[in-house]
């Protein structure tokens, strides 16, 4: 009886391990963002130009119930115009749980640790940085049997510090590639930095 129980437990653990292994997903993606800024940095402002920014990410999802999924992302929030140039990047570590996942939609909730690293050039140079923690939510709504989906995600610390995306995507049925496009808006407000960056983006994702 004892041997049977041990064998049953081992079989259950192996089955769960195999299920978790099948649920593992690793993805890499990047976007190009036609963004424009507004606001000021250390009291300096300008007539902002359109700016081609970028972001890239690595994402790991799995079937282990109690461990969060993870996504590391770097986004370029730089803005410029005339003698004004604000080079700003945001590095994010998103840890989240998938609350719902079915053939029609998925919903994620978690936290984001964000690190800002910037340098202002405006008749001189001024470096600055900032750490913050933000609430994270993401969702995707699928159109069955088409490969198309609508998606959105939000990171927010308060009403003056947020970053959201809304868009649509298409996943090819015969290759692990997804194309996407949409709108992104980020508002950054800390210390002597008060800027908003928004615009249309397009990009893709490759799943391993």
Predicted segments — roles?
Residues 30, 56-62, 93-97, 111-113, ...:
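Residues on the lipid-exposed face of transmembrane beta-strands in outer-membrane beta-barrel proteins
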Residues 30-32, 70-78, 109-114, 147-159, ...:
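Transmembrane beta-strand segments that form the barrel wall of outer-membrane beta-barrel proteins
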Residues 48-49, 80-87, 103, 129-133, ...:
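Solvent-exposed loop/turn segments connecting transmembrane beta-strands
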Residues 64-148:
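Gram-negative (and chloroplast) outer-membrane scaffold detector with strong preference
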């Amino acid at each position: 009886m004892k041997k049977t129980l041990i064998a049953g437990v081992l079989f259950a653990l192996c089955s769960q391990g195999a299920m978790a292994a099948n649920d593992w997903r690793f993805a890499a993606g990047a976007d190009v963002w036609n963004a424009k800024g507004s606001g000021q940095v250390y009291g300096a402002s300008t007539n902002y130009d359109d700016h081609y920014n970028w972001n890239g990410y690595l994402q790991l999802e799995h079937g282990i119930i109690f461990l969060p999924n993870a996504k590391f992302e770097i986004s370029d929030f730089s803005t410029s115009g005339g003698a004004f140039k604000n080079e700003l990047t945001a590095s994010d570590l998103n840890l989240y749980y998938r609350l719902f996942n079915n053939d029609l939609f998925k919903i994620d909730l978690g936290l984001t640790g964000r690190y800002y690293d910037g340098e202002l050039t405006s008749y001189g140079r001024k470096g600055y940085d900032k750490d913050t923690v933000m609430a994270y939510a993401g969702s995707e709504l699928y159109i069955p049997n088409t490969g198309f989906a609508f998606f959105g995600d939000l990171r927010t610390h308060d009403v003056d510090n947020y970053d959201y995306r809304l868009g649509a995507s298409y996943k090819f049925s015969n290759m692990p590639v997804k194309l996407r496009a949409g709108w992104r808006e980020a508002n950054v407000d800390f210390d002597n930095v008060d800027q908003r960056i928004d615009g249309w983006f397009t990009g893709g994702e490759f799943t391993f």
